[in-house]
Amino acid sequence: MGDIEKGKKIFVQKCSQCHTVEKGGKHKTGPNLHGLFGRKTGQAEGFSYTDANKNKGITWGEDTLMEYLENPKKYIPGTKMIFAGIKKKAERADLIAYLKQATAK
C-alpha cells in the first residue's frame, strides 16, 4: 500500500486541475472521483464520457488503477483524458492509496 500523504501531493500536482474527490464535488474537465473504487468505467453520474470509457467495462480498483494510471490512452484507447500517466510504480501506489481514502469519505 502506498503513502497517503505523498499520494495527496501527487493528486494536487497532477490530477486536481481536472478532478475532484469529495462527495458532491462537481465535475471539471474530468469526472468527480467520489465512489471510484468498485465503480465501472464511464459511470459517474452527470459526466459526459467517451464511448471508449463507457464500453471498457472494467471495475475500478487498485489493480485496474495501477495499470490505467501508467498510461491512460493505452489502457482505454479513445479516452479524452489527456494525462500522459505516471511511470513510477511507487508514485502510482501512493496516488491510489490517497484516492482509496479520499473518494470513500
From Swiss-Prot:
Pfam families: Cytochrom_C. GO terms for molecular function: electron transfer activity; heme binding; metal ion binding. Keywords: Acetylation, Electron transport, Heme, Iron, Metal-binding, Mitochondrion, Respiratory chain, Transport. The modification N-acetylglycine is found at residue 2. Coiled coil: none annotated. One of its GO terms (cellular component) is mitochondrial intermembrane space. It comes from the Eukaryota. Heme c binds at residues 15, 18-19, 81. It is found in: Mitochondrion intermembrane space. Transmembrane segments: none annotated. Electron carrier protein. The oxidized form of the cytochrome c heme group can accept an electron from the heme group of the cytochrome c1 subunit of cytochrome reductase. Cytochrome c then transfers this electron to the cytochrome oxidase complex, the final protein carrier in the mitochondrial electron-transport chain. This is Cytochrome c. It comes from Columba livia. The lineage of its organism: Eukaryota, Metazoa, Chordata, Craniata, Vertebrata. The gene is CYC.
